[in-house]
């Protein structure tokens, strides 16, 4: 009975545009018996720029820069990098990666159109012309065996001094820096720039329930400023 009700509520939110507050509580049976899930660190835009500027300006370094830029701007999973293609006469970038939906028999995610969220340098947005560079087949680095792209990216970056510094910055906040931290940046920035959770979930290639379970923490990052604004006087009260 409970599973049926949960399924109905998820359907209403994911397919019928009901508000996210109707989602049932997320329960992961595996989490009860396994170790605590690590908290993924979202890279900031300034950290991404710092990292990219530190990578070597040579053939190999430029391939990895391109990969990092794509992951940050489009919110890619590392494995998405293998499955990129264009549609609509080259005007749209898509990922054809089909990821298993954990716990759901045989279900996988569908191909999705990718939407850029540009990295900012202060008040200016940086356009790295990623779609154009992909169209002319700018090379990406070797990503190893299928399903191991995250490990390949991590192996390369862990050798770099700036990445080690960023790891320490993440650990100081009780979080973990991984190859997915570029994707976490995308989610955090989408929330910060005012996109709706369902829009962000669709662009990242998962359903709203999964998104809320993984990224709801980014929805409350601006609590301090929100309460500061709420406590500002709206005007003088007449005596």
Regions of interest found by a model, annotated:
Residues 1-16, 27:
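Non-catalytic DNA-binding core/recognition domains of DNA-processing enzymes
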Residues 1-3, 21, 25-78, 82, ...:
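Basic, Lys/Arg- and aromatic-enriched nucleic-acid-binding interface segment
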Residues 42, 99-103, 204-228:
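Catalytic-site neighborhood detector that most strongly recognizes the C-terminal catalytic loop/helix
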Residues 69, 73, 180-206:
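C-terminal catalytic core of tyrosine-transesterase DNA break-rejoin enzymes
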Residues 114-175, 180-182, 186:
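Active-site/catalytic core of tyrosine-dependent DNA strand-transfer enzymes
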Residues 229-239:
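Intrinsically disordered, low-complexity basic tails/linkers immediately adjacent to helix-turn-helix/homeobox/MYB/SANT
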């Amino acid at each position: 009975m409970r599973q049926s009700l949960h399924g109905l509520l998820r359907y209403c939110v994911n397919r019928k545009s009901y508000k996210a507050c109707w989602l049932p509580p997320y329960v992961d049976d595996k989490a009860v018996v396994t170790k605590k899930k690590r908290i993924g660190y979202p890279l900031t835009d300034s950290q991404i720029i710092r990292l990219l500027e530190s990578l070597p300006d040579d053939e190999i370094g430029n391939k990895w820069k391109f990969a990092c830029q794509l992951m940050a701007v489009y919110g890619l999973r590392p494995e998405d990098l293998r499955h990129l293609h264009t549609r609509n006469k080259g005007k749209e970038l898509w990922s054809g990666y089909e990821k298993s939906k954990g716990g759901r028999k045989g279900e996988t995610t569908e191909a999705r159109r990718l939407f850029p969220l540009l990295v900012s340098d202060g008040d200016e947005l940086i356009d790295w012309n990623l779609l154009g560079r992909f169209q002319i087949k700018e090379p990406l680095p070797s990503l190893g065996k299928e399903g191991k792209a995250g490990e390949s990216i991590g192996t390369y970056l862990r050798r770099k001094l700036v990445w080690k510094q960023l790891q320490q910055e993440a650990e100081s906040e009780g979080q973990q820096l991984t190859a997915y931290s570029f994707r976490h940046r995308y989610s955090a920035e989408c929330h910060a720039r005012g996109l709706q959770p369902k829009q962000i979930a669709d662009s990242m290639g998962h359903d709203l329930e999964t998104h809320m379970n993984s990224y709801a923490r980014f929805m409350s990052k601006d609590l301090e400023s929100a309460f500061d604004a709420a406590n500002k006087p709206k005007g003088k009260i007449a005596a």
